């Protein structure tokens, strides 16, 4: 697909979900790459019953907005407590973007992608940049304490 500005685009609207507790350089790297592939990106600050974030999705969304460069004008941030697929349907997104740092992440993401595909939403898996792959949110929280 070609965007009106003549740039190559994979699609119109994609969603990049995560807990982002906190946002890491790896997350920002995924957003940076994805924003060039789609006309619009929504970074979806979500809940995850397996994780206990330090703040609410709304609080993390506010913090994440502050971290994004001002010129990333095709990137928006939203907080969401439901299923990512439901958000995609409600907001007209047809692709979910996910990042993977290692083999374990890829295995987990392939399972999620299969479920999303069965529900009609495509997943685009972007590998982490090698220099950022070790910097998880867990590591970032440890560095902050």
List where the protein language model places each region.
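Nucleotidyltransferase catalytic core that binds NTPs
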Residues: 1-145
């Amino acid at each position: 697909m070609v965007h009106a500005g003549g740039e190559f685009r994979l699609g119109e609207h994609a969603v990049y979900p995560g807990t982002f507790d906190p946002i890491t350089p790896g997350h920002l790297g995924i957003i940076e790459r994805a924003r060039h592939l789609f006309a619009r990106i929504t970074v979806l600050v979500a809940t995850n019953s397996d994780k206990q974030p330090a703040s609410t999705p709304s609080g993390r969304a506010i913090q994440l907005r502050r971290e994004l460069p001002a010129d990333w004008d095709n990137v928006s941030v939203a907080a969401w407590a439901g299923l990512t697929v439901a958000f995609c349907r409600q907001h007209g997104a047809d692709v979910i973007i996910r990042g993977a740092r290692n083999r374990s992440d890829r295995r987990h993401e392939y399972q999620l992608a299969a479920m999303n595909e069965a529900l009609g939403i495509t997943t685009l898996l972007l590998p982490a940049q090698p220099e950022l792959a070790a910097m998880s949110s867990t590591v970032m929280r440890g560095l902050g304490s």
